[in-house]
């Protein structure tokens, strides 16, 4: 029998909207800063939370900021237990380093959908591998020139684009950009191990799916047919970097 209680309106129990309002007030107070949740909870769940909390507490607001995240898919399919394709953070870091997982997650704005797949993770790994070429210890923490991007609703893709720009400038000899580049990477949790430790991590066995390998081979075959040998060679090098050898 479902749990319930008698009331002037009949037997029943608090709904899930009320549960969240009660927990929020107990642990955070009548008005607090940030409330998060998926885009699918904006209505009716969050709207009902606001209505009942404000009515009960005689306040004009409930949470000062609402953060609604987009959905994560796996190879363009919805992640769900029924499909058996749930990937947890602990699962991901067993296959890739924490830095790679972090950069992959930050590559999309929190409010936008993100497709989790081998290509995303390998691109993130290759990016960090490239960035480590300009890694340096620095005591300077100046990033004011580019941090405004993050202040724009946590625009992480825009911030990462700025890091790419700084890398290019630093690679061409701009020392000021090199310092900013390193500080920006550290701000989002990258460069949390030394260059040597990163090299050791690269040697660990990173597995890629058969589906990904076949896809890249097909792309290379197509590139060769179109006489795009530059692309074909790049795909071959990328696969070689992942421990996959192609022999023509």
Predicted regions and their residues:
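Alpha-helical recognition segments enriched in aromatics with Gly/Pro capping
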Residues: 1-139
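Structural preference for alpha-helix termini/caps and helix-kink/transition segments
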Residues: 78-248
């Amino acid at each position: 029998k479902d749990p319930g209680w008698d009331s002037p309106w009949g037997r029943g129990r608090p709904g899930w909207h009320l549960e969240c309002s009660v927990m929020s007030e107990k642990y955070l107070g009548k008005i607090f800063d940030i409330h998060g949740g998926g885009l699918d909870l904006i209505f009716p769940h969050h709207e009902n939370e606001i209505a009942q909390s404000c009515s009960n507490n005689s306040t004009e607001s409930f949470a000062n900021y609402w953060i609604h995240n987009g959905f994560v898919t796996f190879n363009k399919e919805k992640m769900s237990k029924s499909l058996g394709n749930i990937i947890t953070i602990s699962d991901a870091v067993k296959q890739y380093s924490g830095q790679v997982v972090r950069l992959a997650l930050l590559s999309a704005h929190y409010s936008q959908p993100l497709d989790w797949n081998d290509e995303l993770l390998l691109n993130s790994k290759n990016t960090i591998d490239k960035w480590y070429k300009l890694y340096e210890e620095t005591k300077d923490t100046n990033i004011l020139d580019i941090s405004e991007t993050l202040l724009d609703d946590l625009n992480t893709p825009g911030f990462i684009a700025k890091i790419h720009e700084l890398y290019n400038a630093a690679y061409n000899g701009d020392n000021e950009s090199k310092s900013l580049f390193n500080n920006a990477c550290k701000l989002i949790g990258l460069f949390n191990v030394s260059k040597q430790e990163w090299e050791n991590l690269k040697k660990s066995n990173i597995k890629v799916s058969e589906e990904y390998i076949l896809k890249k081979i097909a792309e290379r075959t197509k590139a060769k047919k179109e006489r795009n040998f530059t692309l074909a060679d790049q795909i071959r090098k990328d696969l070689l970097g992942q421990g996959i050898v192609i022999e023509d």
